[in-house]
Amino acid sequence: MRYDGTVIRPPSEADSYILQVTYGCSHNECTFCGTYLDKPFRVRPEVEVLQDIELAQEVLRGTRRVFLADGNALVLGTRRLTAILDALHCAFPDLQRVGAYANARDLLGKSQSELELLRDKGLRIVYVGLESGSDEVLRRIHKGATAAEMIESVRHAQAAGIRVSVIALLGLGGPELSAEHAQATGRAVSAMDPRYLSLLTLMLVPGTPLYRQWRNGSFELLRPEAMLAELREIVVHLEGLTGCVFRTNHASNYVPLAGTLPKDKSRLLAALDDALARGRSALRPEAWRGL
């Protein structure tokens, strides 16, 4: 298998075969993200993708999961995606699911029948970076979508039978917009009612616009305790979920939590209250945090 540049995947895809079908991110303007700063977006030639699948077939027999990289593989047209999915199922008879990152524009750009076709071909989960439910925060970070568009895109995918894992980012509004960010994020996720919700904590990446804003004083990073308080506020505003698997086990977070909402909401809030009462001693040390 051949890879170009930095390749990332969600923690839940740790055991998946990672197949690059695009390079970089077609948007690549989010001010906090440094993943693809050195990798201009381009579509990988289809013949190369199919060759990689043939190579993987020889060494990854028994593969059950595949993740399509890079930043938003669903930018590809439906015909090309179905050809890739067909080739994967031919190469890996035991394949159970294929996953990919997707943004609102990608999902809304495909019809219901197109998404249903992709689901039938094996695309069973997409990972969507909501980041924030606040339109002001989304505008400042140059996300390229409004909260309403993000909500619509997740509902659109789920209506086609594709599971969605939503990702939001603690601290993204700084102290100024912390309350708005937390409350609006909780409301947006509630409106989405996704199968999975993961919260990460902002870590500034050198070379990104947000890092430069922090250096020049125009953006302020939340203190760890304030990050935790923001997390609690998001959980408080999560209402009407129907079996959402909730995780804060990413290495960027100060406190790892896991549960299913709404069943475990009271337990999660109690754990957060305990951590807030204990202060720094309850938090993951900075040296242990990472992206």
Please give the residue ranges for each predicted region.
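Aromatic/hydrophobic pocket-lining residues that form the small-molecule binding cavity
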Residues: 49, 81, 111, 150, ...
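Conserved SAM/AdoMet-binding glycine-rich loop
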Residues: 57-159
